[in-house]
């Protein structure tokens, strides 16, 4: 099998596939004013999703994560899961969700073939959760995480965007929460975007602060599998849960990059903070275009840069994280 490899010998096993940029939350670090449609958009159809996922599978992709926006806003979300999972080469099919539909739908997603779930929970304080997300749905999301375990998921990942003077002093509360639960809690450093410069300057804090606290408390870093995301994961014998740290401003963060992104409009993005994407959609209309689609993906990858330029304050075309799913 051909394996996607770039000019810096990095191998790519992981595709983050956005299926919508619509979201019903108004998170302060992403869409503080809520989702505002910019004209009429036509997101990838079920057939187009099938074709792009199949092409990446033929290029060695083992893991696909469905992102948004909020992926479950798609009425055909369960069908999307089932369609991708028909391909045995895709060993892991994950979703990142705000969790508001978990209680109702997670068992159905599991039955359709979903293998992994990430849920965004930036605070364990219901009032602060409401303030961050613009939605009074903390308890509904918590019930949804329980529903995921009931549906048969043996682990749930929970994402929390780390923000100074918001949740950076809540480590002990989060640790108490995951001690009896098989939850991998992932602290994600706040990243600068085109629309979020002021927020970044006010609230960014390095994940290294959390890492130092974990090491002092006896947590140990574990090795990463080839299709894992960018988190540094820590475990402790006294805890069922784990802690992950995603620190894009850390030296050599990009050296282990193993993932590519396709937007809900069918553009290939080589980096979350890259420039204009490469269109794939004109090659998603027919199965007969598969060879040409594969060739375009391979050719485009050779232009991927060695690193992002966040340290220079350059966030590329990413205006907010709903744009291509973070």
From Swiss-Prot:
Residues reported in the UniProt entry to bind [4Fe-4S] cluster 1: 23, 27, 30
Keywords: 4Fe-4S, GTP-binding, Iron, Iron-sulfur, Lyase, Metal-binding, Molybdenum cofactor biosynthesis, Nucleotide-binding, S-adenosyl-L-methionine
CDD domains assigned to the protein according to its UniProt record, in alphabetical order: Radical_SAM (cd01335), Twitch_MoaA (cd21117)
Amino-acid positions noted as binding S-adenosyl-L-methionine in the UniProt annotation, renumbered to this chain: 29, 69, 120, 191
GO molecular function: 4 iron, 4 sulfur cluster binding; cyclic pyranopterin monophosphate synthase activity; GTP 3',8'-cyclase activity; GTP binding; metal ion binding; S-adenosyl-L-methionine binding
Pathway: Cofactor biosynthesis; molybdopterin biosynthesis
Catalytic activity from the UniProt record: GTP + AH2 + S-adenosyl-L-methionine = (8S)-3',8-cyclo-7,8-dihydroguanosine 5'-triphosphate + 5'-deoxyadenosine + L-methionine + A + H(+)
Residues that hold GTP according to the record: 16, 65, 96, 157, 259-261
Taxonomy, superkingdom: Bacteria
Keyword Lyase: yes
Gene3D superfamilies in UniProt: Aldolase class I (3.20.20.70)
Top EC category: lyase
Tagged with keyword Lyase: yes
SMART domains, alphabetized: Elp3
Biological process (GO), any one: Mo-molybdopterin cofactor biosynthetic process
PROSITE patterns according to UniProt: MOAA_NIFB_PQQE, RADICAL_SAM
Domain Radical SAM core: 7-240
Record EC number: 4.1.99.22
Signal sequence extent: none
Oligomer status and interactors: Monomer and homodimer.
Function: Catalyzes the cyclization of GTP to (8S)-3',8-cyclo-7,8-dihydroguanosine 5'-triphosphate.
Name the record gives this protein: GTP 3',8-cyclase
Organism for this UniProt entry: Yersinia pestis
Chain's gene name: moaA
